[in-house]
Amino acid sequence: MDDLIIVDCQYDFIDGTLACAHSHEAVAWLIDFINTHEVRALYTSDWHSETNGSFKKNGGICPVHCVAGSEGAALDPSFPRDIKWSANRPSKENLFLKGLRDDVEEYSAFHGMNAEGKALHDVASSHVYVGGIASEYCGKETVLSLLQSGRSVTLLVPGLGWVAEEGHKKALAELKGLGALLVEA
């Protein structure tokens, strides 16, 4: 069975401090994909402390976002509510946290860890689908890491949210050029 890695579909990237374009549509599309395809869902979450170095208040460039345990860090509630097969709903086994270190900006979810201490790269299958938010940042870097590890990646374009459309298109072209397959519909 192939995996679907759902990158950072969290409140702050959907309706919060770093809300992205097409995020609501991406979540709905991903849920439909999960419900109509035989895949194993793996979720990633940005998970920061209040003292994270990427925050403007701490000398970084980003507004405060995805603080561990906050509303902003919560996955979209549609995932546990609307996914039919319970094993594909978010759980401690299939949720991988990244951005835990204050001194490192971690866009890629490749090294994200679940509650059992397993890294995403240790459990992901040889072929993965990827969707989520934001295509130019965490989505792109996660796909790059997966490709560099020798995995086959199918990027689900309708299941992506983005910061800026120009950056989104540029990221898609770059990833396609590096070997990712793009599914447009």
Segments from the language model and where they lie:
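Short, structured patches in soluble enzyme cores that scaffold and shape functional sites
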Residues: 45, 97-100, 132, 157
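Short, small-residue-enriched loops and turns at beta-alpha junctions
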Residues: 103-104, 160-165
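Short, well-ordered secondary-structure micro-motifs
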Residues: 54-55, 106-109, 141, 166-167
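Histidine-anchored nucleotide/phosphate-binding helix
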Residues: 31-34, 137-148
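Active-site acidic carboxylates
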Residues: 1-96, 126, 151-154, 163-184
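Residues within well-ordered alpha-helices
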Residues: 75, 119-120, 142, 171
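Histidine/lysine/aspartate-rich catalytic loop segments that bind and position anionic ligands
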Residues: 89-121
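Glycine-rich anion-binding loop/nest that anchors nucleotide
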Residues: 127-141, 155-160
